[in-house]
Amino acid sequence: MTTDLTLALDAMGGDHGPHVTVPAALQALKFHSQLKIILVGDKTEIERHLQHSAGIFLSRIQIIHTTEVVNMCDRPVLALRTKKNSSMRLALELVRDGKAQACVSAGNTGALMAMAKVLLKTLPGVDRPALVSSLPSMTGRPVYLLDLGANVSCDSEALFQFAVMGSVLYEVVHKTSRPKVALLNVGVEEVKGNDQVQQAAQLLHHTEQVNYTGFVEGDEIYTGNVDVIVCDGFVGNITLKTSEGIAKLLVSELKRGLNQGLFVRFLSKLIAPRIHAVLSKMNPDHYNGASLIGLRGIVVKSHGNADEAAYLQAVNLAVTEAKRRLPEMIKDRLESILLDINS
């Protein structure tokens, strides 16, 4: 990193608040020498977690005090109307006003999307932002899944826009031309799926600038046969949470199995580095951080129950996206694609 970069963190968001967000912020400052962080939240709580560990990083930390918090049970519209001094909203306003290049929050997903859409506005040609995150695959290449919960129900046009944005994002981040895009469906046959998925497929079939390959089923998500998988937020969120639960089960069973019997324990020590690598790849925390794409600013959503290491992943993602100026790059590519589609 060659120039200063400022992130705004919703320090009160998520299940653990400053107990997680503040230590993760300090770790990020350690890794990124030009990074500055604005912590938005209750100053007393934030300073309590900074007291014994901030040290040389204090000059790169700013606190904006507020005691108002968006709760996980708050309705998005109500939070938008009534919680105008919340830590989430103030963090987003810093991005809107150009005082920060990105915002990270582990708070209420619906409220975050509603506030971000109102404050940051969507890019030209985008009706709804979408949450997207990378997942591991059998090929070693990441797979992008969207939407992950920002839009519980979607029409065909929204799914089409998600496909375009996901394709552009993959190109920008991974410098890959024409990534393979698919719609998540209950079958691969062309006649399968509800009206929204069917109509989105027709739109994508007639779009040359998107490398649409057809439908994929749930068991193909992690094969790496496609790069971008599109679905509505209801399906995407359940898919993601189910996958995380299965990953945790597999890790737990593997650890339990390796502790049974003297010979197995001895063997496991010999191959410990390889086991650690496998477990790390399967750990959902390693992939924490979903990007709210389609906005004029950068917003990264962390899991609400993220621990320090997982939240740090979300902060690192925000740093990467800010360094690469993703909104500007997506805007340019998106305008080109939509212009070609509409011409």
From Swiss-Prot:
Keywords assigned by UniProt, alphabetized: Cytoplasm, Lipid biosynthesis, Lipid metabolism, Phospholipid biosynthesis, Phospholipid metabolism, Transferase
Keyword Kinase tagged: no
Catalysed conversion reaction: a fatty acyl-[ACP] + phosphate = an acyl phosphate + holo-[ACP]
Cellular compartment(s): Cytoplasm
Alphabetical list of InterPro entries matching this protein: FA_synthesis (IPR003664), Phospholipid_synth_PlsX-like (IPR012281)
Pathway: Lipid metabolism; phospholipid metabolism
A GO BP annotation: fatty acid biosynthetic process
Enzyme class at the top of the EC tree: transferase
GO cellular component, one term: cytoplasm
Listed Gene3D superfamilies: Isopropylmalate Dehydrogenase
Quaternary structure, from the entry: Homodimer. Probably interacts with PlsY.
Protein's name according to its UniProt entry: Phosphate acyltransferase
Organism name: Shewanella denitrificans (strain OS217 / ATCC BAA-1090 / DSM 15013)
Gene name for this UniProt entry: plsX
